[in-house]
């Protein structure tokens, strides 16, 4: 049986940490764990997901939950409550529902204080890892038989009815998702006609019916070229010489959004070397299986710009194609021949590897994310197959693997801090500290230990890195990458804890550490008042014309976001209250400009586009809470009034809200099919309305939403998993498995604290 291990570094000599592995979560298979009852529960969960896989794509993340609840012998003792139609939502009912959820969720806390959870969903994360291990000869050593079977399970369970695989688990079939998962199945041992429900042959049919693998998007062409399944001449140029350009030029990689930069970095190294894996009999078979014409007859030059229509989200502008054609026809032929291949290309490759090693070391070989992880690992192996750099990469592979009832997948890189910061705020809002003091103290300890204590090493500005001392990452301290909203949410938690009794929640964070966090936030605000996520924005907008991907938007440069801005405004308003003299004018100016940004980016219909959650509901929650924190109210701010009207106009008959992920790529509000409600989105909308003062005007919409949340709670205090609610780069969805607990609890807590108590006080008067 698989077991989740917490804060465990194991005995691998090639792994190192900054804080004793706090936040690390890895799965290990325990052959001795053979309890028949537990095995039966796991198998039942798998079968239930399989039979409902076309109705509900995200899993319920049950395996670790079963493990933790069993280890803690948790039993729900508080009776379930229901609020009948026409019945008033009483203080007692909401308290009972909240307490049931809080007790269950507290039992799900890990020993180091964080809340584990799956953070995955894209169908292109795992296949490159399998390809890399196959190329390097480590597939059998890293992927045991149990790893293989669970990885194949995930592929089988998320195959679409038409035989293909999507860009993400809820998406329509794409060439990118289908080709990568087809290759993955074959590398893991499935034959051309193998796989559950004829998965392999059905996948191959989809590929051939849609034009074959030559129409895979550009990232796919890169991986196929690495594998020897395409020729590098079928790829657009990715010259590593860009790293040699003067840094003041606008197209220098240092000006790129960090994720774009980190992907381009190892890709350009592999492209510059024209690295191709050893051609094995399996590779020769795959060449015959995924192309519609013989491999040696494909005109690779003609397929460079070809992309399957099912994959196309962001068509390349003509200007970009002209740039690639110029580099392809003139620059590359020169740089790959003597003497320039010795004078320039060799130096460019060395510079690129210098950056790769720097980023690897400063993230403890986790790297910034899973796409980059695999590419950097492969680049290190290409440079030195027996080197320590590659061995350090191997040691961190378990950090990315996650198992649930739908199988094993690769995570984005883990959402440990992000989920925990929200969880803490939800629990604090419940006002049940006397019941969950130990839980809060452990969570506080995790937050404090997860703060980044130093800037990146050495001349970090010369390596195009920003300050990180005092920040929080999305996952854990070892990851190292500062994120503005993660920093703001971590700072909020520490400030809230500092207002509580230390004998209950532990010692407060030192003021100097809080100041470091404030410094990070202040350093990131743009001239327009908004906040980017990772690094200061400011590169020219026209660089987005060079977006080389066909399935993402806004990936070339850093941009400002409503969520990051709101989180930072909320954190600094609370900080100013507790530390009114520290950098007072800068903090006040930040809050004023941040609030103005939130007003300025509101859509004409009163909504805000959510960049990291689905979508306008998510954006509205953040915007309204941020504006409220800055002193904006329904009476003095038109943006608040329009935002409230937007949410009220889309409330459903059952009292909830439900928004389709299609809102994200379409950039317009799209309701869920059949006007279904989603409990996470209902919670976002409810909290947004609460902070906008809806109770003072008409609390009925709030009562209806609270009734839906209470009545939807399950017998054990959990909430049902529903549609996917996370997103990145507008077109790829992300499954935040903890959201189904965090946000209904948080919304009920705020409702109880701000609406029910207010109502009770009014009655007494």
UniProtKB/Swiss-Prot annotation:
Q: Name the keywords, alphabetized.
A: Isomerase, Repeat
Q: Which reaction does it catalyse?
A: (S)-2,3-epoxysqualene = lupeol
Gene Ontology terms, cellular component aspect?
lipid droplet
Catalytic residues as annotated in Swiss-Prot or TrEMBL: 485 (proton donor)
Database matches in InterPro entries: SQ_cyclase_C (IPR032696), SQ_cyclase_N (IPR032697), Squalene_cyclase (IPR018333), Terpene_synthase_CS (IPR002365), Terpenoid_cyclase/PrenylTrfase (IPR008930)
Tissue specificity remark: Expressed only in the epidermal cells on both sides of the leaf and not in internal leaf tissues.
Q: Which GO terms describe its biological process?
A: triterpenoid biosynthetic process
Q: Which SUPFAM superfamilies match?
A: Terpenoid cyclases/Protein prenyltransferases
PFTB repeats, residue ranges: 148-189, 640-681
Which is one GO molecular function term here? lupeol synthase activity
Q: Per its database record, what is this protein's job?
A: Oxidosqualene cyclase that generates lupeol, a triterpenoid product. Lupeol is probably required to coat the leaf exterior as a defense compound against pathogens or herbivores.
- What name does this protein carry? Lupeol synthase
Give the species this sequence originates from.
Kalanchoe daigremontiana
Q: List the top taxonomic levels of the source.
A: Eukaryota, Viridiplantae, Streptophyta, Embryophyta, Tracheophyta
